[in-house]
């Protein structure tokens, strides 16, 4: 399995709201993708400009198919436009 932790930091609180909306839409749409084990968005309890997306995928093929979908490309572009993303990936 593959676990992705995506840390997002917004440039402004307005951009945070836009990015969080896009992240929640992405999580909702991704719940139905083949091979998804978990896909959640977690706003920070201590820093108002930060949230984390945690994804778990059955295998690399499932993750690759997810990453190639139009909604993934569109919504990730919105998130990236609003701030900085840092990605951690783990295989287990």
Where do the protein language model's features map onto the residues?
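Short S/T/G/P-rich N-terminal loop/turn motif that feeds into the first structured element of a domain
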Residues: 1-51, 56-68, 86-92
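Outer-membrane beta-barrel domain signature
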Residues: 72-81
